[in-house]
Design a protein with these regions (language model features):
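Extended alpha-helical assembly domains of large eukaryotic scaffold proteins
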Residues: 1-388, 392
Length: 396
């Protein structure tokens, strides 16, 4: 009974002269009687009935209340403005309830702890809004690294919001890429960079190259799709060509190579290309490049490459010149190739040499009826007698 009276006296003393840390420490030392509330909690109860608590009192009340698992009381007093919020109180509450700690930090105006709580509770969209409102500038890179480690998917969303902020990027794009790749998060890094680089700016060439590099090494089909969409224009083309070749993306490699030695090395693998695409590709090359590449294809693997070489020779016969193509096939003694190539152009040609070489190739490949037809129907049949003597010695 005496303790109860003493508690009331201390709690209601004029101008709070007895409302001191020393009083609190003394009451904490008083044993609790069975079936009663501890003296210190009785003291705080009287204070809460008549006023609100100061910083020190709030801390000393929070400790036993939270220890007893009665955080709902703390929430009630917080809403009633009965306790004074501080960073120290937030730190105590944080080990029990992150959202309640967030409320404390917000009221106490502790920006760094508020931002940390937003991150811990997954409220990433609120971080930038809050920071701008209170004029606080967090270390967004460090914050992002923390978010990415906890939740990579939300980290990607948060990263995009940081670099596309209305007031300008809040974190460097390359720094963000480093953060994702340091965690080996290739998919998230790709998703982020595709969004961040969508404007296809000249100053982003190095990042375009990096995006393609990481996918050519780790996910070639993704790189193939990106290149196929023609999204970027400023990356290191020779570097990407080389990596595409190593990844087995021969078409992409050939699209990017400009050096003839590189073109010849890749084009010989005709079995790895869509034939129609490969034929169209030769339309981009000069005459000398085309002939050099065709020679290399026949030299490397005639059995594999002859069919597409014939198609290319046929498509670009007028440009490359029949005499040079005839010479090419003859240099490899490919009368089959010569027969199929000339067979596609002979009916449109007025060159006696073409008709003669076709007849000769047909003979060498056993196409007797075709020999008879061309000799019978060719308008240039009589011209064959004017062929030079060395050539006519070859039996037809």
């Amino acid at each position: 009974g005496q303790y109860s009276e003493a508690i009331k006296v201390a709690a209601t003393s004029p101008r709070g002269v007895l409302r001191t840390p020393q009083t609190i420490e003394q009451l904490k030392q008083v044993p609790t009687q069975p079936g009663t509330l501890s003296p210190i909690l009785q003291y705080f109860g009287v204070l809460l009935e008549n006023s609100s608590l100061n910083k020190y009192e709030s801390l000393e009340l929070a400790k036993p209340v939270l220890a007893q698992g009665r955080k709902h009381l703390l929430e009630k007093w917080l809403k009633e403005n009965k306790i004074e919020c501080s960073e120290e109180l937030g730190d105590i509450v944080r080990t029990h309830d992150m959202n309640l700690a967030l409320s404390v930090y917000l009221r106490a105006n502790v920006p760094n702890k508020v931002v940390a709580c937003f991150a811990e509770t997954g409220q990433y969209s609120k971080i930038v809004l809050y920071a701008k409102k209170v004029g606080y500038s967090p270390d967004y890179a460090t914050l992002l690294r923390h978010v990415v480690r906890i939740n990579p998917e939300q980290g990607a969303e948060f990263a995009s919001s940081l670099v596309t902020d209305a007031d300008g990027p809040l974190v460097d794009v390359e720094r963000v890429a480093d953060i994702f790749l340091s965690q080996n998060l290739i998919q998230q890094a790709t998703s982020f960079l595709l969004d961040a680089l969508k404007e296809n700016r000249p100053d982003q060439g190095a990042l375009q190259t990096r995006l393609l590099e990481i996918n050519l090494v780790n996910a070639p089909q993704v790189a193939d799709a990106i290149l196929g969409n023609n999204m970027f224009s400023y990356y290191d083309r020779p570097r990407i060509a080389n990596l595409a070749e190593k990844a087995g993306l021969m078409q992409r490699a050939l699209e990017h190579y400009e050096d003839l030695a590189d073109i010849k090395r890749v084009v010989v693998h005709s079995n790895l290309f869509n034939t129609e695409w490969l034929v169209e590709y030769f339309g981009r090359l000069t005459v000398d490049q085309s002939l050099a590449a065709l020679y290399e294809m026949l030299k490397s693997n005639m059995r594999q490459n002859l069919g597409v070489v014939v198609q290319i020779a046929t498509r670009y016969s007028e440009l490359l010149g029949a005499p040079r193509l005839i010479e090419m096939f003859e240099s490899f003694r490919s009368f089959e190739g010569l027969y199929y190539y000339l067979g596609s152009v002979v009916n449109l040609s007025s060159d006696p040499e073409v008709h003669f070489k076709y007849t000769q190739a047909a003979t060498r490949t056993g196409q007797v009826r075709e020999v008879e037809r061309i000799c019978r129907e060719s308008n240039y049949y009589l011209s064959l007698i004017h062929i030079s003597e060395p050539t006519r010695r070859t039996p037809i």
